[in-house]
Amino acid sequence: AIIVPTAMMSVYTHYKHNAVDFGVLKSYGIFVVFGVILGSFFAASLHTKSLILFFSIVMYLLALNLIFLKEKTKIKLKFSLFQRTFFGLIVGFVSSLMGIGGAIMNVPILKFVGYTINKSIGSAASIGFLIAIFGCLGFLISGIIIKTNIPLSYGFINIPAFLIFIPITIIM
């Protein structure tokens, strides 16, 4: 839940610098949201060790991708419906399982389809805000459904941690 206000601040900052493409937010973000919803309910059914293993493998693969990623010389802006659906569902699903905003995946994807680095980063931040909101709702609802009974929590959201860390994360 802490990611919601920090993502909101990030989007606002990128928006002020004209680095958010709202077209990609609408046309791609909807598929990311579906992936987040599926992922948050799936994550609630997994054991902690499974999530740790999944997180480790995905981080390793993402690191390899960043190491070997090559810049495109010709930029052709084309983000087909198939690409938006495929990447959106995967990014949303993986982001919710890992508890991340998805920029580590969305920036390379948006660069791959031809967005400038500034638009890729700003648009990835705006998509991260969608991931934050729907991930938070998904973990809230799935935690209530499976009756987590975690003290001082609603679903998987710990209220004291949320209240303590919000001021710290927004200031930074």
Across the structure, where does each feature detected by a protein language model lie?
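Transmembrane helix-bundle signature of multi-pass membrane transporters/permeases
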Residues: 1-3, 124-132
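Juxtamembrane transmembrane-helix boundary motif
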Residues: 7-92, 97, 109-119, 129, ...
